[in-house]
Amino acid sequence: MGLVKPKKFLGQHFLKDLSIAKDIADTVDVCPDLPILEVGPGMGVLTQFIMQKNRPVKVVELDYESVAYLRENFPALEDNIIEDDFLKLNLEKLFDGKPFVLTGNYPYNISSQIFFKMLDYKDLIPCCTGMIQKEVAERIAAGPGSKTYGILSILIQAWYKVEYLFTVHEHVFNPPPKVKSAVIRMTRNETTELGCNEKLFKLIVKTTFNQRRKTLRNSISSILDKENPLSADPIFNKRPEQLSVQEFIELTNQVEAALKNKTDIVYSNDIARKGTNKKE
């Protein structure tokens, strides 16, 4: 069959530059010997170099046309092509419950969702690499005090060391995206336990960053009553982008300890969804 036509509704931008594809494939070398799962292989420009790593490889592709192309041009991959939506997969079943490396030239329209799913399976994914929008990569790698520091930054950096590796320009894609891209690598840090109530931690992070112009005192009033003595702590005069991951962990412990009846804590996504049109 001929070349696959990129589909806008799937966020497809096919990489044309083989040297960049090889560089992306080489980012998985930090986790040697582990099997590899590639998301959104398209026509296999990255896949061909991943397969040279001599490790078990599976690919997940939703586009039926791309699947047909892969089956025709990568016969050795035949039994390891998963025609499905990555976001709906049970990742525990892919490699018999064993850890694996996640990589890909990720579809731009779901890149953030891919990383939230990665966090759900963080104990199975010690390393995640790949290419995404430059803006999203900068957010993930951002530190406290940065305008791009946000929900993704905190939640990912709580569990992973993040490396912004290099920038990729628009002209090496078909079709060229309207934004620059970047290659990043996320490697699990030594954290095995967060040191706080993880569900409350996520709620506080999402709630405060969805109201990032407000001080913590105002943004978490839905969780902690303003009359609570804890609200007098100077930390509540800060805005969320001023806090490190560790400070968010400490804040979570303070808030939980201050609540009189812990069973009354509402771990509701409804609170966290406030301002969901804002960037994560």
Curated annotation (Swiss-Prot):
Its main location: cytoplasm. It comes from the Bacteria. Disulfide bonds: none annotated. Its EC number is 2.1.1.182. Pfam families: RrnaAD. GO terms for molecular function: 16S rRNA (adenine(1518)-N(6)/adenine(1519)-N(6))-dimethyltransferase activity; RNA binding. It catalyses: adenosine(1518)/adenosine(1519) in 16S rRNA + 4 S-adenosyl-L-methionine = N(6)-dimethyladenosine(1518)/N(6)-dimethyladenosine(1519) in 16S rRNA + 4 S-adenosyl-L-homocysteine + 4 H(+). It is found in: Cytoplasm. InterPro entries: KsgA/Erm (IPR001737), rRNA_Ade_diMease-like_C (IPR023165), rRNA_Ade_Mease_Trfase_CS (IPR020596), rRNA_Ade_methylase_Trfase_N (IPR020598), rRNA_adenine_dimethylase (IPR011530), SAM-dependent_MTases_sf (IPR029063). GO terms for cellular component: cytosol. S-adenosyl-L-methionine binds at residues 13, 15, 40, 61, 85, 105. Keywords: Cytoplasm, Methyltransferase, RNA-binding, rRNA processing, S-adenosyl-L-methionine, Transferase. Specifically dimethylates two adjacent adenosines (A1518 and A1519) in the loop of a conserved hairpin near the 3'-end of 16S rRNA in the 30S particle. May play a critical role in biogenesis of 30S subunits. NCBIfam families: ksgA. Belongs to the class I-like SAM-binding methyltransferase superfamily. rRNA adenine N(6)-methyltransferase family. RsmA subfamily. This is Ribosomal RNA small subunit methyltransferase A. The lineage of its organism: Bacteria, Pseudomonadati, Bacteroidota, Bacteroidia, Bacteroidales. The gene is rsmA.
